[in-house]
From Swiss-Prot:
It comes from Ruegeria pomeroyi (strain ATCC 700808 / DSM 15171 / DSS-3). It is a multi-pass membrane protein. The record marks 57 as: Reversibly protonated during proton transport. This is ATP synthase subunit c. InterPro entries: ATP_synth_F0_csu (IPR000454), ATP_synth_F0_csu_sf (IPR038662), ATPase_proteolipid_c-like_dom (IPR002379), F/V-ATP_Csub_sf (IPR035921). F-type ATPases have 2 components, F(1) - the catalytic core - and F(0) - the membrane proton channel. F(1) has five subunits: alpha(3), beta(3), gamma(1), delta(1), epsilon(1). F(0) has three main subunits: a(1), b(2) and c(10-14). The alpha and beta chains form an alternating ring which encloses part of the gamma chain. F(1) is attached to F(0) by a central stalk formed by the gamma and epsilon chains, while a peripheral stalk is formed by the delta and b chains. It is found in: Cell inner membrane. GO terms for cellular component: plasma membrane; proton-transporting ATP synthase complex; proton-transporting two-sector ATPase complex, proton-transporting domain. NCBIfam families: PRK07558.1.
Length: 74
């Protein structure tokens, strides 16, 4: 019974990886919309774009690690 609950928890934690993909899409889409409105400011905002993508991906990686821990360590 406990192993089954760990697998369910791992599946729920893996949803965070999909949510990270949605977050990266939102960050990149909003950057593209802003760059199309004001192309001269796009070059100065590229670093902010990569920082936002890195934070969104980090959350996805943490969710993936939690899923792995629940699958194999519990």
């Amino acid at each position: 019974m406990e192993g089954d609950l760990a697998h369910i928890g791992a599946g729920l934690a893996a949803i965070g990886s999909g949510a990270a993909a949605i977050g990266v899409g939102n960050v990149a889409g909003n950057f593209l919309a802003g760059a199309l409105r004001n192309p001269s400011a796009a070059a100065s905002q590229t670093a902010t774009l990569f920082i936002g993508i890195a934070f969104a991906e980090a959350l996805g990686i943490f969710a993936f690690l939690v899923a792995l821990l629940l699958m194999f360590a519990v």
